[in-house]
Amino acid sequence: REGSAYRKVVNENDITNILRKKGFKIINPQLYKIDEQIEIFANADKIIAPHGSNLANIIFCDPETKIFEIGPNYIFDFEKNIKTKYEKLANLSGLKYFKINADTVNVKNHSKIAMKYVSKKILDKSSHFKNMIVKLSDIDL
């Protein structure tokens, strides 16, 4: 989630080091043209990514591709649709979906756009607007 104001994985470097040792290629989809993103996702056997719009690219994956979504534990009713949208997309696409639950860390400074359109109460309470820490033992793919 490079460049994002929230849902960053605080220990991302530790995770990417583990994944590289397991043979994963680490990419930032935002740095690729859409046709390159399609090719990358279409040729992947496994995708591991934090919750965010880049996961929409899983629609280009072959059936049976394993999708590992890193995300917080959403607990509020208003977070229900957020919680399951990529799981539903994976299931509709015939993919194998797995969730890696992350602990949350408060964000000190929310983006101006978030502060303009989202109530302070939601920004402060919702896991959607926090950063994440993943237990390294959970990266056992």
Q: Residues of each region from the PLM?
A:
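Cofactor-binding loop segments of dinucleotide-utilizing enzymes, especially the Rossmann-like FAD-
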Residues: 1, 70-72, 102
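Active-site donor-nucleotide binding/catalytic segment of nucleotide-sugar enzymes
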Residues: 1-16, 27-32, 75, 79-86
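Extended, non-globular alpha-helical segments
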Residues: 12-27, 32, 108, 114, ...
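Short acidic loop-to-helix transition motifs that present clustered carboxylates
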Residues: 30-36, 53-54
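Structural alpha-helical scaffold elements that stabilize or flank donor/cofactor-binding regions
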Residues: 39-40
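A donor-sugar binding/catalytic signature common to diverse glycosyltransferases
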Residues: 43-90
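Leloir-type glycosyltransferase catalytic cores
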Residues: 84-141
